[in-house]
Amino acid sequence: MQGDIRRKKDLLPRYKTGSKYNSRRRGGYLTTPMKKIIVYIILLCGVYFVIKVAYSDLNKETEIKLESHSSDVSASASDHTNIAAGGAADATNNKQPQQAKVPKEKFNNEVAKQQEVKNLENDLKPQIDSEKQKQINKDKKEQKQQLQKEKQDLAKENLANNEILDN
């Protein structure tokens, strides 16, 4: 049923090896062992960079910067005296009302969240006396008036120069 045995001109080149008989074997540099070596080198490089990044953060010194304003410094100094006095000055100097802490599970109301954000923003802003605020506003108005006067003077000078050039 199989017919004659053909060895020299076999239809399937079973025992013939080399790139001229098999189109898949062209380019002999990327053999399986070479691919394994390349993957191993890439893996080692990846592990090296991961360790390098992980330990580079540990070598740096941690820097903690707090935003401080002049009013915050005075408020923090009064807080330290309150702590040293055992809270006796708390009853007399109640500048900052203490807010009750609410657990996160019960803090579901969106309006309450927004109000809390506003309160936190107000606490972080430096509290300026109304007199200081008025003085700042006056200074700003004076600066604007001076700038307007300077612009008008420059415009008059330009007109005078143009008239002189025209004559």
Curated annotation (Swiss-Prot):
GO cellular component: Golgi apparatus
Comp. bias (Low complexity): 71-80
Basic and acidic residues bias spans: 1-13, 102-156
Superkingdom, taxonomy of origin: Eukaryota
Annotated segments matching region Disordered: 1-26, 67-167
Note: Present with 2190 molecules/cell in log phase SD medium.
Protein name: Uncharacterized protein YKL063C
